[in-house]
Each structure stands twice: as C-alpha cells, then as structure tokens.
Amino acid sequence: HCISSAASDVYKRQETYNKENYENLHAYGPKSNYDYHTTAHDRAMDAGIDDVGLGVLYGLDSYEYEFIGQLMHAEHLEAKYNVGPHTISVPRIQPGDDVDVDDFENALDDDVFEKVVACIRIAAPYTGMIVSTRESEAMRARLLDLGISQISGGSKTSVGGYTANVTEGSDQFELSDNRTLDEVVDWLIEKDHIPSFCTACYRKGRTGEVFMEMVKNVGIGNICQPNALVTLKEYGEDYASEKTRADINALIKKEIGSIPDKDVREGTKDNLAAVEKGKRDLYI
C-alpha cells in the first residue's frame, strides 16, 4: 500500500477514514494504528518527500463519509504544506477471492461511483485521478469522460505477477479489464485521448509546490503535450503492434500543430524525428 521511488513520492491508500470501522478491520499488525496510518503523508512531507497520493477503498463505509474524508485530507495537506495530493485513487469494493460485493452494504453502484469521481475532479482540478483494471472497459470509458486521467493496462494482481513464475491462486482481486497495454493504448487513441508515458516532472524535480503552481496556473500545457507525444512515439517504435503504431503516428500528425508555443512545437518535431531515427529518452 505504500510505494516510494527514489525518495521522491509516496502513495498510500487509507482503506477507510472512519476510525471505528478502520480499527475493526485492522485489529492487529503494523496497520492497526489509525492515527499513525492516517498521518503517513504528513511524515513524508516533513521528511522532504513533497509528492504524495491519496486513496480510499469505497464500499467499506458510506461513500459520503469517505468522499468528505478524502477531500478534507487533501485540504489539510494543501493548508499545511501548500501542496495538495499529486494523485487521488478511487478504487471500490469489487469481486475477489472470498469477496462478495453483496456482503458490503456500502458498496457503490455505477451511477453513484460516477458522481463521486466527477465531484472529486471538480473539487481538486489540479490532481491526477487514478482508476484501476478492477473496473470494466465500459466503466473506465465513462470515467475518463468524468475526470479520470490515469489508467493501467496489462495489470497483474498476483504475487510475482510480472515474473515468469507466477504463484497460482495468489490474485488479490479479480480484474474486470484484461486487455493488454497495446490494446488500451489504441483504445485511448480511438477515444481521442493522448496516451502519455511521461515521467519528466519527477526526473526534473517538478514536484510538490513547483508542480502545484504550474498546474494551477495552467503552465504545464507546453510541457505535458509535447512530452506525451514524444513518449508515445517511443512506445510506438519499440513496443506497439502494427495497427497501434499506425494510429499513434496518425494521432501525432493531428496533434503536433496544436502545441501553442512555436519554439516548443518545433523542438517537439525535432524530438519526434530523433526518436524515429533511434534516439530515446527525450523530454522537456
């Protein structure tokens, strides 16, 4: 539940903000201390890790309680550190081994879940919003139109799932979207989105307060779009199927002219040409 990368970011899922419910679900073990668990982001920020992500498992308690808790947590971080969450994740209770959604009286139906996602997007327009492959292709398509900005493809939930020898029967939960990454990328293009593999902001130190200032003042556009196109081009050259590669090139041709700054636009054209000739890892 907690991932740190080069001491630059921390993503932690709260499970539930209801203290009583949390303690019932975590009766013992290192996660049993509600206060310590809930203040993990504060400790990360105090230690100089200025990029954090929030998440709550919708369905463990009433969605109203969790929704308010999540936004109050974001508001607290912004008030104390002048930096809101870089991402907000919105998983919900889904079927899995020994997990029946009908056993959870607070499980969200699709319509309510869509409203929760839309309201979080309105309340925190600066944040990246994540939905996983627990959701179906149809639901992920609907959520993309409501504010989701980050999705996965080709995910594994089993122990050692990305290795050659997978531990059988170790899946944490069932996937509802089993498409490959290539299929998800091409699907996004068909839906008029620009898939991006960019990590430039992390690598250049554009995190925390610097990142927040840029996204809140719409200063990130001349960076995100060019980097998205160049990283997508690199994916197309190295990994994509023939159809997806063709769709990537068509998308780039359509989008390149919409980069507002002329110098950035020309630089992006140069980077795209360089990628086609074999250069890699180019970004602003």
Task: Outline where the language-model segments fall.
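Radical SAM enzyme core and accessory elements
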Residues: A141-S149, S155-I284
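Short acidic/His/Gly/Ser-rich catalytic and metal-binding motifs that mark active-site loops
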Residues: K19-Y22, G96-D100, G161-Y162
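Catalytic cores of large soluble enzymes that bind and process phosphate-bearing ligands
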Residues: V10, S62, E66, E105-L108, ...
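Phosphate/diphosphate-binding glycine-rich loops and adjacent basic-rich segments that engage nucleotide
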Residues: D9-P30, H41-A44
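Residue-level "edge-of-site" marker
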Residues: E15-T16, L57-Y58, K156, C201-Y202
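Single conserved hydrophobic/aromatic residue that forms the stacking wall/gate
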Residues: H1-A7, Y11
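Glycine-rich tight-turn/loop motif centered on a GG-T
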Residues: Y22-Y34, V101-D109, G169-E174
